[in-house]
Amino acid sequence: MDMNSRDTLVTELNVLGDFDPIIPEAWQQPDYVMLGNLSPQVQLTTLERLTRKPKLVVMDTMNFWMDIALDDLKAVLKRVDVLTINDEEARQLSGEYSLVKAARVIRAMGPQTLIIKKGEHGALLFGSEGQTFFCPALPLEDVFDPTGAGDTFAGGFIGYLASTGRTDFEAMKTGIVYGSALASYCVEQFGTTKLASITSEDVDARLAQFRLLMTEKA
């Protein structure tokens, strides 16, 4: 079974179809914002209801919104710092097959930093000054369910940045590794089961595996 691709038969928005993001006053001045994969209009409304510009806004989206709300999506892209999408979505949004060319086109739409996820083949980070970083995926013997891996990746990425207070490219490189490490746990069991059971020591152990993978020479 190829878990790097999906065939979406139908998308039902259900309660999210008319979701109105109400932000409590105490949360209206965050330093870091993660716009999850909801409609571009919800994402835009969320930003408009903040009373202070965040240090960093990270956004996730998917091909569904490119199909039905492209203009709204482009409006949100103008207001975010980092976009995270997969390789198929990057090609659709940019109209370019080469991911390097796709990154250039997408960054011109607004987000100065772009993350392109490639499933079991890792992730690419394109920086605001033309920098590029590749983080491999950890080879796993068993992959139970990839659902939620992208959300986990994004959470690990921005969570690391928020914990350090940094937004520079070097910090983002480490954030990519944290996101990849957590996502590698997510796919090992269904839902949040695995993530709910791991400890900080488990995360450190997996980070060590990533460092070994990225530095070991033949």
Each model region followed by its residue ranges:
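Acidic, amphipathic alpha-helical patches
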Residues: 23, 73, 143
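Conserved N-terminal subdomain of the carbohydrate kinase-like
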Residues: 1-34, 49-53, 204-218
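Short gly/ser/thr-rich secondary-structure transition/capping motifs
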Residues: 13-18, 61-67
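Short catalytic-loop micro-motif centered on adjacent basic/acidic residues
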Residues: 32-35, 58-60
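Conserved phosphate/ATP/ADP-binding segment of small-molecule kinases
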Residues: 48-56, 64-134
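Structural motif corresponding to alpha-helix initiation and N-cap regions
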Residues: 20-21, 44, 66-70, 96-100, ...
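Short beta->alpha connector loops
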Residues: 37-42, 62-66
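Conserved phosphate-binding/catalytic region of the ribokinase-like
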Residues: 99-218
